[in-house]
Each structure stands twice: as C-alpha cells, then as structure tokens.
Amino acid sequence: MQISDFILVIIGSVALAAGVKYVFTLTSGSNKDKKGGEAEKGKQVEKALDPQEYRKFQLKEKFIVNHNTRIFRFALPNEDDILGLPIGQHISLRAVVGGKEVYRPYTPISSDEERGYFDLLIKVYEKGAMSGYVDNMFIGDSIEVKGPKGKFNYQPNMRKSIGMLAGGTGITPMLQVIKAILKNPSDKTEISLVFGNITEEDILLKKELDELAEKHPQFKVYYVLNNPPKGWTQGVGFVSKEIIESRLPSPSDQTMVIMCGPPMMNKAMTGHLETIGFNESNIFTF
C-alpha cells in the first residue's frame, strides 16, 4: 500500500494561523492524490528538478512513522508536475543551519506516478543538522533541492537477479528500484532483499515490503534484527556472510548486489561479498 493510498487523520491541535506544525498519522483510505504516470491528453508534464541549480519546494504535509522517523511531503510547482527522477538516482537538499550551508542526499520513496508532490522518508538524529532542520520546518516552509544525482542507472532486465542489502533508511533507494521492477510486467528481474535493523519497530516500510513480496513471487525479503522480539523467526544479529550466501543470488555475470546503509555496514558487506566471489563490477553502493 502506498503513501498516496492513505487518508490523513490529524492528531493533536493544529492551527496554521498560529504557525503550529502539522502532525499526521496514517490510515487506509482514498488515493485521490495519485494521478498516474501517463500524461493527460493535451497537457505537457513538467519535470520539477533541475540538475544545474537548486529549486525551492514547500513542505505540504508531514507523516509520523515512528519515534524518530517521518515522511515529509513536498509540493511541486503544479499539481500535474512530476519530480523527474530516474530510477536509482537521488536528490540533494540544501539548507543554512547555524550559519553554515548543509547538503545531504536523499532518495524519495514516491515516484513519478504520484504527480504534484514528492515524499522523503527521513530518520531524525539528535545531532543531525539536516534531519533536525527538516523536522523543525512548518507547513509552507521551503527547502532547496537539486537533482537528479547519482551514478546508478537502472534499466529493465539489466541483470537476471539483483540482491539488495539495506540498513535503516537505506531502504529508500531499494524501494525505488523494487517498485520500478515490479510495476513493469516485462521486467523479469528476480529481487532478493536482506534488510537489517536493530528492533522490529525500526523496520521502515515493512507493511509495504511484505505486501509486495506476497503479491510478486519474483521479490523476496528477509529481515535481520540485532534485538529481535520473542518468537522472531528470521535473522538475528548482524548481516553475516552466511546470510548473504543463503539469501542473495550467487555471483555471476547475470547478478549484482546493490547496498545502502551506514558506512560501517557497507564496508563489512563489501568484504563479505568479495569473499563470496562478487567482483567490483557487480557491487554498487548508494
């Protein structure tokens, strides 16, 4: 189920005139915001991104995911505009924090099928300059965005199998690729995702991932938790070489592994993959 398939239920007192931030929770409902990926006849679809300059986008809505993670929805200039972000690419956010310019890369969890806005899943860190800045924005405030950026360009059926290793909010570029593959009937790429987190509550977008796996046999997901709950039946501890060997495709010219997580995780995973037999050309780190 996509974010655009939810209705918004306001919790707490909010008052735009008083400058109070909007806080939302999510329940299933209407998909009225989703316009679809096809252009209406007679209308030109405008891409909102510019790779050469930063453009301002207003915060439209804010969704609470858990105690430290939010989904921020930013409005595009017109309701029929698309962000214009190729699969596998990301955007750069710029803001002035404490008198200094701060830049951070983010991958939207929305796609160009959702017109008029884009969604960012952001974990708010206690001392995170950009995440704290965005979390403190009021509805109507603007953030500067530039893109597309990135070196990964996904093409349908570019490999027979793609393995994915994600940690925390590193799930965002993975979800972008997963959804692109699964919505294309002619793309037969097999996808295997290993997703590491600390607790079950930390697993972001779990419901959507589980629904995609249930609906599409070509997609499999395996969760690994440092601190699992009682009765947990999947991976425990850290993502190991043994887990990678059993859950991801074997090395070959027709397979590759893409990963996104904390730097220490990426370094460890690269070591495991090389030990298993993956060469550098078949490994990509976001």
UniProtKB/Swiss-Prot annotation:
Stretch forming the signal peptide: none
Pfam families: FAD_binding_6, NAD_binding_1
Gene Ontology MF terms in the entry: cytochrome-b5 reductase activity, acting on NAD(P)H
Top-level taxonomic group: Eukaryota
The keyword Zinc is assigned to this record: no
Cofactor: FAD
An annotated GO cellular component: endoplasmic reticulum membrane
Gene3D superfamilies in UniProt: Nucleotide-binding domain of ferredoxin-NADP reductase (FNR) module, Translation factors
Functional note: Electron donor reductase for cytochrome b5. The cytochrome b5/NADH cytochrome b5 reductase electron transfer system supports the catalytic activity of several sterol biosynthetic enzymes.
Assigned protein family: Belongs to the flavoprotein pyridine nucleotide cytochrome reductase family.
Assembly, per entry: Monomer.
Name this polypeptide is given: NADH-cytochrome b5 reductase 1
Organism the protein comes from: Dictyostelium discoideum (Social amoeba)
